[in-house]
Curated annotation (Swiss-Prot):
InterPro entries: DEAD/DEAH_box_helicase_dom, Helicase_ATP-bd, Helicase_C-like, P-loop_NTPase, RNA-helicase_DEAD-box_CS, RNA_helicase_DEAD_Q_motif
Compartment(s) of residence: Cytoplasm; Nucleus
Comp. bias (Gly residues): 14-43, 50-65, 520-548
Protein name (record): ATP-dependent RNA helicase DBP2
Domain Helicase ATP-binding: start-end pairs: 158-333
Region (Disordered): 1-70, 500-562
Function: ATP-dependent RNA helicase involved nonsense-mediated mRNA decay and ribosome biogenesis through rRNA processing.
């Protein structure tokens, strides 16, 4: 959590919060731990068993239960725009160098950066940080980070966001989307009236996973410190108490996963009356994970004349419908093609094998990949159990592997990510859900131990490597059970100028008869594969294998592979 005490200065002068979070908030912590923590925490969101322990909604209060607090089902307010306080949202002033560029120059720049735009009166793209028009206090933070130049999505996204328009940004994961909305949000906040006691946030960022939410918070903290902008991260799987305390003190930015935020709203721990800048990050992922009802419930709580920014890696019809419902006359920028495609800097290798061969092939590829000591390998498995089993197997064989999946506690997930980021462990085994939104620099190899259920997830998975123009390698184990992916996988590989192995090409058939034939083949093999897999687990897992966090606690074998 990030909280800055002391005077808060906005762009128009004046101070806010001198002492507001000082002695009073310290007292709140003392009161909270004295009166509340005796009961302990009993989990996270409503579907995880609720919350036990001290109820906190102000300095020093304790006792009671979070679930004992009155809860009110959220209903959509009836908005009267005439009665709502006015607010500023257009802060863009075109730089003279940008204004001087010809239409031909702009068209050429967009073409070189695979940039397409849609809508009317779209601001011209910028090419340098100085052209973006950020105030000095924001610009200095950017320069201090040592970025050489804006990414393509930032070149077009910053002018769009600063103009106050509703906007859609479509670009691959790792393209710089977070800063595309984070920096304009700082300018937006500093132009708004100061928060008063009991006010909710000014900026709300919705994200699909806690890992992505924490990463966004890190960026907001880094670039908001010069303005003393306070933020909090509200997500499930962690105690509610610290999150409630941050909200009670007042934060300008709230980064949240949908389920936990609804918990807070229904319990009256915060409100969205002050939100004038709404961000939906990885909108496609949120919808894939079934968050659409929660998103709609949350957005209905926000004034309709807000500025809304939607960011997505893909453009499926579900995201388009959400856009039509909640964005007003939006402008859109797309980096790359709207057609699903893999990065051309990634070498894609597909091996058509059976289930029994996966472990041996995995070890062979690890031996090759870890010849370079700085390489990082991300291994994807289809289930939490498989994650732990692979990790246990690798560790028993001396490989420095750690697992991350949804059944692990947040502190263990954070630890695994930190070990992987810092290179203390070179192999991380993950499920799709656990890996969504994770941004780890320097991943050199992605191995699909199990293929994903759809081609979109395949592209997202392998996109963890080959970022920022660097090269990467994606290795996939394709079995008969993955035959429905065959045609789409061949198409993705050909588009990226990859060699499609002949064994995979035989699955590139879309007729009903072909699917029936492959389906019948899968049935017979599936039974034998299941029995063999269970036997393998019994052999190394020790009577039933490892559960939950067991894989990460398995000792490293004597044959150290690093």
């Amino acid at each position: 959590m990030s909280y800055n005490n002391g005077g808060y200065n906005n762009r128009n002068g004046g101070s806010y919060g001198g002492g507001y979070g000082g002695g009073g908030s310290r007292g709140g912590r003392d009161g909270y731990s004295g009166g509340g923590r005796g009961g302990g925490y009993g989990g996270g969101d409503r579907d995880q068993g609720g919350y036990r322990g001290g109820r906190f909604s102000g300095g020093g209060r304790g006792g009671g239960r979070f679930n004992d607090a009155p809860r009110q089902e959220l209903t959509a307010p009836q908005w009267d725009l005439e009665q709502l306080p006015k607010f500023e949202k257009n802060f863009y002033s075109e730089h003279p160098d940008v204004a001087a560029r010809s239409d031909r120059d702009i068209e050429q720049f967009r073409k070189e950066n695979e940039m397409t735009v849609k809508g009317h009166d779209i601001p011209h793209p910028i090419t340098t940080f100085d052209e973006a028009g950020f105030p000095d206090y924001v610009l200095q933070e950017v320069k201090d980070q040592g970025f050489p130049k804006p990414t393509p999505i930032q070149c077009q996204g910053w002018p769009m966001a600063l103009s106050g328009r509703d906007m859609i940004g479509i670009a691959a994961t790792g393209s710089g989307k977070t800063l595309s909305y984070c920096l304009p949000s700082i300018v937006h906040i500093n132009a708004q009236p100061q928060l008063q006691y009991g006010d909710g946030p000014i900026v709300l960022v919705l994200a699909p996973t806690r890992e992505l939410a924490v990463q966004i918070q890190t960026e907001c903290s880094k670039f908001g410190k010069s303005s003393r902008i306070r933020n909090t991260c509200v997500y499930g799987g962690a105690p509610k108490g610290p999150q409630i305390r941050d909200l009670a003190r007042g934060v300008e930015i709230c980064i949240a996963t949908p389920g936990r935020l609804i918990d807070m709203l229904e319990a009256g721990k915060t409100n969205l009356k002050r939100v004038t800048y709404l961000v939906l990050d990885e909108a496609d992922r949120m919808l894939d994970m079934g968050f659409e009802p929660q998103i709609r419930k949350i957005v209905d709580q926000i004034r309709p004349d807000r500025q809304t920014l939607m960011w997505s890696a893909t453009w499926p019809k579900e995201v388009q419908q959400l856009t039509r419902d909640y964005l007003n006359d939006p402008i859109q920028v797309t980096i790359g093609s709207l057609e699903l495609a893999a990065s051309h800097t990634i070498t894609q290798l597909v091996e058509v094998i059976d289930e029994f061969s996966k472990r041996d092939r995995l070890v062979k590829h690890l031996e090759s990949a870890l010849n370079e000591k700085d390489n990082k390998i991300l291994v994807f498995a289809s289930t939490k159990r498989t994650c732990d089993e692979i990790t246990t197997y690798l560790r028993s064989d001396g490989w420095p592997a750690l697992a991350i999946h949804g059944d692990k506690e947040q502190n263990e997930r954070d630890w695994v990510l930190d070990e992987f980021r810092k290179g203390k462990t070179s192999i991380m085994v993950a499920t799709d859900v656990a890996a969504r939104g994770i941004d780890v620099k320097g991943i050199t190899h992605v191995i699909n131990y199990d293929m994903p259920g759809n081609i979109e997830d395949y592209v997202h998975r392998i996109g963890r490597t080959g970022r920022g123009g660097a090269s990467g390698t994606a290795i996939s184990f394709f079995t008969e059970g993955n035959s429905k992916l065959g045609g789409d996988l061949c198409k993705i590989m050909r588009e990226a100028n990859q060699t499609v192995p002949p064994e995979l090409q035989r699955f590139d058939r879309r007729s009903y008869g072909s699917h029936m034939r492959f389906g019948q083949g899968r049935g017979g093999r599936g039974g034998r594969g299941g029995r063999g897999g269970r036997g393998g687990r019994g052999g190394y897992g020790g009577g039933g294998g490892y559960r939950s966090t067991g894989g990460n606690s398995a000792p490293l074998g004597g044959n150290r592979r690093f």
